């Protein structure tokens, strides 16, 4: 599966315990999304277009109206990255 660099970064943050929050307008449409890391920072690479691509590829999912998290397919699609921790 072809995954772009911003999608890969977002999946990596989600695999480490992050989540995606949708922000809606008054009409109920999703206007922006925020990808939060497990440390509480916000990832700037996660845009509405990236979120829609990940959702269309079924790499992220939401259960019971909770924030979006990575699912099994997303974990299999993400490539390993080295971290300085």
From Swiss-Prot:
InterPro entries: YjhX_toxin
Domain of life: Bacteria
Protein family according to the UniProt entry: Belongs to the UPF0386 family.
NCBIfam families tied to this protein: PRK13687.1 (NF010240)
HAMAP family on file: UPF0386
Protein name: UPF0386 protein LHK_03186
């Amino acid at each position: 599966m072809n995954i772009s660099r911003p999608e890969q970064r977002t999946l990596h943050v989600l695999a480490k315990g992050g989540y995606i929050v949708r922000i809606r307008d008054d009409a109920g449409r999703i206007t922006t999304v925020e990808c939060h890391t497990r440390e509480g920072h916000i990832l700037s690479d996660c845009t509405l277009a990236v979120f829609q691509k990940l959702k269309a590829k079924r790499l992220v999912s939401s259960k019971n109206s909770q924030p979006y998290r990575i699912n099994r397919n997303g974990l299999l699609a993400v490539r390993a990255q080295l971290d300085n921790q």
